[in-house]
Amino acid sequence: RDRHVGRAIALLHERPADPWTIDELGRQVGLSRSALHERFAQLVGQPPMQYLANWRMQRGARLLREGNATVATIAQEVGYDSEAAFARAFKRSVGQPPAAWRRAQRVATPPLDVRNP
């Protein structure tokens, strides 16, 4: 493993809502933008900003599925400036708008009935 790439991944996971750029991420981990981009893509299989976009979608999907926060709140938590921008990116990634996806997930996985174990 590469400690710089590992640190970059940790930062993206810890602070997905930060307005990351490849320059800022490189500064944080002590690499030039080109060195970080090359190492990250080689080890992870995708460039850092693409990884961040995918991570934001994964985290957003988990928050939609497991919580009751509004789509606007989730959008901010995962780094989008607006609910509309998050909704567009989510639909492009998942194939459904966030609210429709959330409803479908809840129908597909109803809560357990703990009264009748």
Q: Which residues does each predicted region cover?
A:
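Basic/polar phosphate-binding segments, predominantly the helix-turn-helix DNA-binding elements
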Residues: 7-58, 75-100
